[in-house]
């Protein structure tokens, strides 16, 4: 394989640029040419494809976001979109593709491989919700950004004797909430993976104020549960009498210079993705498990270790969905006594 391409797709995540840099420089060291694709699969279909060299990725390792831009392009799920993208790949002499993104991005990589264009997926999302890896690129940075913000909110919360509900991203996964909540000393953490009793949450706030001598209370809420405003309304309906404020950290968690950990795992996975393509392997996703590099088939059976399977009706299902560490939820409860 002499010429490959790299793209980023879906939501941006700190560390994507580090992964792009690794793909480009590793490929060049192996005697391969690299092309960048702007705006993910949308750019592939539009032919927004251009050469990338070492100079183009210089000084990118410390930058957040993705300099290749990103976009969601549901049309690529259809055969017409796939064939249009493949036509552009052929036009530019591209033989393989590295795809950095989440589940939807992996589905595109799977389709490319089926059409004879080996594609390798790299997990890039702050949500840390992709099967086949313990950590995704961007997660560590997002957690650190959340902790910094919660630490600052604690200052104002304690100054005014208030309760703060801090909503964090994560889609349907509670990883950011759990890790940031523990690291910031949150009083309560609410995640989608665990049922909660709103009346117990309210009574815990009251008990902390009246019997523990606390003058403030921090609740970290994963967005997959409900919005912070809706949660606050339910708290009041459950009898909470505290001076309550809501802060949604929102997209700030996607930005910022990536942490050292995100830069390292992005570089590690990007380099390995190139090695796989060099060997002509596609339809695989790179990941980290027990601090070691792993690779999994994107499509296949659960017994084969594949991330996704197809039902008889042609529906894509996740074989081993990512699960947040609920032992961390128990840990935080024991530490917030």
Swiss-Prot record:
Names of the cofactor(s): Mg(2+)
Positions bound to ATP: 11, 72-73, 102-105
Keyword Cytoplasm in record: yes
Cystine crosslinks: none
Keywords: Allosteric enzyme, ATP-binding, Cytoplasm, Glycolysis, Kinase, Magnesium, Metal-binding, Nucleotide-binding, Transferase
Activity regulation, free text: Allosterically activated by ADP and other diphosphonucleosides, and allosterically inhibited by phosphoenolpyruvate.
Residue numbers binding substrate: 125-127, 162, 169-171, 223, 245, 251-254
UniProt-annotated binding residues for ADP: 21-25, 154, 185-187, 212, 214-216
Annotated GO biological process: canonical glycolysis; fructose 1,6-bisphosphate metabolic process; fructose 6-phosphate metabolic process
Binding site for Mg(2+): 103
Active-site residues (renumbered): 127 (proton acceptor)
The protein's assembly and partners: Homotetramer.
PANTHER family the record matches: ATP-DEPENDENT 6-PHOSPHOFRUCTOKINASE, PHOSPHOFRUCTOKINASE
Name this polypeptide is given: ATP-dependent 6-phosphofructokinase
Organism: Streptococcus pyogenes serotype M1
Gene transcribed to yield this protein: pfkA
């Amino acid at each position: 394989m002499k010429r490959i391409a790299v793209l980023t797709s879906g939501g941006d995540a700190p560390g994507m640029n580090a992964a792009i840099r690794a793909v480009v420089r590793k490929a060049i060291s192996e005697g391969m040419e690299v092309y960048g694709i702007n705006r993910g699969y949308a750019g592939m279909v539009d032919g927004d494809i251009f050469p990338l060299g070492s100079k183009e990725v210089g000084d990118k390792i410390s930058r957040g976001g993705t300099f290749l831009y990103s976009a969601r392009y549901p049309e690529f799920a259809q055969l017409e979109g796939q064939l249009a993208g493949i036509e552009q790949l052929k036009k530019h002499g591209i033989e393989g593709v590295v795809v950095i993104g989440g589940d939807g991005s992996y589905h595109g990589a799977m389709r490319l491989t089926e059409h004879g264009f080996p594609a390798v997926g790299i997990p890039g999302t702050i949500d840390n919700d992709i099967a086949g890896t313990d950590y995704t690129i961007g997660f560590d940075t997002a957690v650190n950004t959340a902790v910094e913000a919660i630490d600052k909110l604690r200052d104002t919360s304690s100054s005014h004797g208030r309760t703060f509900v801090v909503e964090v991203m994560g889609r349907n996964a509670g990883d950011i909430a759990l890790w940031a909540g523990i690291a910031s000393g949150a009083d309560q953490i609410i995640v989608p993976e665990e049922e909660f009793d709103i009346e117990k949450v309210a009574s815990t706030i009251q008990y902390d104020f009246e019997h523990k001598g606390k003058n403030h209370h921090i609740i970290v809420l994963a967005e997959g549960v409900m919005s912070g405003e809706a949660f606050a309304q339910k708290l009041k309906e459950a009898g909470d009498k505290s001076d309550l404020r809501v802060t949604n950290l929102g997209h700030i968690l996607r930005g910022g210079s990536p942490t050292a950990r995100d830069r390292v795992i992005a570089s590690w996975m990007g380099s390995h993705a190139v090695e796989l393509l060099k060997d002509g392997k596609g339809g695989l996703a790179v990941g980290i498990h027990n601090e070691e590099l792993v690779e999994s088939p994107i499509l296949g059976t659960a017994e084969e270790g594949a991330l996704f399977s197809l039902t008889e009706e042609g529906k894509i299902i996740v074989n081993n969905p990512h699960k947040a560490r609920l032992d961390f939820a128990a840990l935080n409860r024991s530490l917030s006594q």
